[in-house]
Amino acid sequence: MTSLIPPWERKMERREAEELLRNAVGNATAEFRKDQWEAIDAMVNRRQKLLLVERTGWGKSSVYFISTRILRDRGRGLTLIVSPLLALMRNQIEAAQRLGIRAETINSTNEDDWPVITQQILEDKVDALLISPERLANESFVEEVLLPVADRIGLLVVDEAHCISDWGHDFRPDYQRLINILRLLPENTPLLATTATANDRVIEDVKLQLKDIEVQRGPLVRESLALQILPLPDQASRLAWLAQAIPELPGTGIVYVLTKHDAKQVATWLNKQGIDAHAYYAGVEHADFENSDCYRQHLEELLLSNKIKVLVATNALGMGYDKPDLGFVIHYQAPGSVVSYYQQVGRAGRAIDRAY
């Protein structure tokens, strides 16, 4: 007599998971990149805690969304994704939908939707919930949303995990509240922490805080990127070079600046030269939009759909902005750190053979 294996105990095979990938990307021959399957296997078959350190554009979100799809099909609870930026959440929700995953977010921009989303979470109708680390400091969220479902969370994802460490370049104190959340979860709940920009010191700090976590570390080289340094001694020469070079660069791109003033100044200059450019920074507003978040989302969509040539942005446009065919990233001034530079140039060339 053949014994039936419950769906939550059946081992997922690579070929089955790869079929989910193919459905998501619409490519019948798509295959996992190096080490993607190993990370998925760690989540769904071995139920481990894993810190994934892989280059920008490698496909870290594919790992946790395919894992979510598998775990939900096995009857597990929702995936909780802690993510630092609204732009990142919007991109992730769209990526989840391609896998048939119902993803929702509770954040400062959708307060009117909170009661409906909360009820759907309690009824187990949501596959993935995306929140900011600051949401973990909200007592009503913890008591009304998190505590009632904590014992059945299927997967915890900590995106941009370098933010946990006070040695990290984007340290966010509320990320450390994750330690309290971990205590609420069943012991065998898998955890996936992801980053592209953690040095050895940050990795050791994350391991210390998340405890008993394995590390999977890949090469950080991006072969599709052609990097150049141009010695331009003053502002006038930099502006002149931008006006000459940007029309000749392929596709659309981002010019990174250090300040709000620079963003407005450079965007105005480029527009005067006939280049369709918009300034992007924290708090940027437009009379036609209700608030800054709505206008920033509009600007992101303009670039995503190639309706403008370039965004002139501060680091407000950073982690998580995902435009696979972004053709170029230019730094008008040197960024604050090498890690910030790596994060920002990593916006370009994710799904094209050559970017600048």
How would you describe each model-predicted region?
Residues T2-E9:
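Interdomain "pre-motor" coupling segment immediately N-terminal to P-loop NTPase/helicase cores
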Residues E9-K11, L20-N23, K34, E38-S61, ...:
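Helicase motor core with emphasis on the C-terminal RecA-like subdomain
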